[in-house]
């Protein structure tokens, strides 16, 4: 339900208000932040994230250099090192692979550059703060939803489609799922659906037709947004196969409303864009930022209304 995100957003609101009370500097002393995403600029989640980040940059009077690597880790690594060379006032980045930023974070800290992670985390790097969901807990919440609602049983094999197998989000979410399913003897199958929209639908449809999975956990937003088209193509009626997973798109929100998806997770994408900038602004002003802001809540047909209203305003 939407209420599960209240605590994290309360902390986030406090950060935002504190940051907004700081008056922007002149053009000559404007702070410069780099924001680096592993996502693609045309992805629905990242469009909303970018809107939030851009709003924060404007409201806080800072210069933000935003880049998207489209899943190319080498390109993101190059962008991070270019940011380090520019000696900015702060860097915010995703961490799509464990250990990807160990050296870079150490170099940034040595240079006195604040580092905030968002969307995907790697606390072992020593980053100063994180904005986003606890992905391992997200996986556990999805699995517990099925168990609590008696939608899976021992011996079932749950379909886990994902865009990028091996990425940190897949690994962490699957760890959370395993913590619930393994003791109960519920099996699961992580399947590479790819990132191409047409390919996702084709691969998922083929799997559903061939395997008749008893339940589905969509580990990413693109696979979650494809559920209706996959089920329609495979001849699966809405509600006959339980589905949970991510819900950061209008498509998935509509799937929840129409019964194709039982419950979906919302990461408050615009807030996830705004808050890293606010945290970097605080750090650049000398304020300590050693805390995380969790942006996550589960919604279903009874609570999807506000999310659909938000999308319909755009």
What are these regions (language model features)?
Residues 99-137, 148-151, 249-258, 262, ...:
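Flexible loop/hinge segments that line or gate small-molecule binding clefts
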Residues 76, 131-157, 200-201, 248-252, ...:
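Hydrophobic alpha-helical segments within soluble ligand-binding/sensing domains
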Residues 44-59, 138-145, 168-186, 226, ...:
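Short, solvent-exposed amphipathic alpha-helices that sit
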């Amino acid at each position: 339900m939407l209420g599960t995100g209240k605590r994290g957003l309360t902390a986030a609101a406090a950060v935002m208000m504190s940051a907004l009370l700081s008056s922007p500097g002149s053009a000559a002393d404007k702070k410069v932040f780099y924001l680096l995403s592993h996502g693609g600029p045309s992805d629905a989640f990242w469009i909303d994230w970018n809107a939030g980040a851009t709003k924060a940059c404007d409201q806080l009077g800072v210069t933000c250099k935003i880049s998207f690597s489209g899943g190319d880790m080498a390109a993101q690594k190059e962008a991070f090192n270019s940011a380090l060379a520019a000696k900015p006032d702060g860097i915010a980045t995703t961490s799509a692979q464990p250990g990807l930023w160990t050296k870079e974070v150490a170099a940034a800290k040595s240079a006195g550059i604040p580092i905030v992670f968002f969307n995907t985390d790697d606390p072992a790097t020593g980053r100063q703060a994180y904005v986003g969901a606890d992905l391992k807990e997200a996986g556990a919440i999805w699995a517990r939803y099925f168990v609590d609602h008696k939608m899976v049983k021992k011996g079932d094999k749950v379909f886990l489609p994902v865009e990028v197998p091996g990425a940190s989000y897949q690994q962490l979410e699957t760890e959370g799922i395993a913590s619930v399913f393994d003791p109960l003897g519920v099996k699961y199958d992580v399947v590479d659906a790819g990132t191409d929209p047409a390919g996702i639908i084709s691969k998922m449809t083929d799997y559903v037709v061939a395997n008749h999975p008893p339940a589905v956990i969509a580990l990413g937003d693109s696979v979650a947004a494809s559920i209706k088209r996959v089920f329609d193509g495979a001849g699966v009626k809405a509600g006959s196969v339980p589905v949970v997973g991510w819900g950061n798109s209008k498509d998935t929100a509509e799937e929840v409303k129409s019964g194709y998806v039982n419950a979906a997770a919302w990461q408050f994408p615009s807030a996830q864009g705004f808050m890293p900038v606010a945290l970097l602004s605080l750090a650049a002003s000398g304020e300590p930022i050693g805390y995380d802001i969790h942006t996550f809540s589960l919604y279903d047909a009874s609570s999807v209304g506000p999310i659909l209203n938000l999308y319909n305003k755009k």
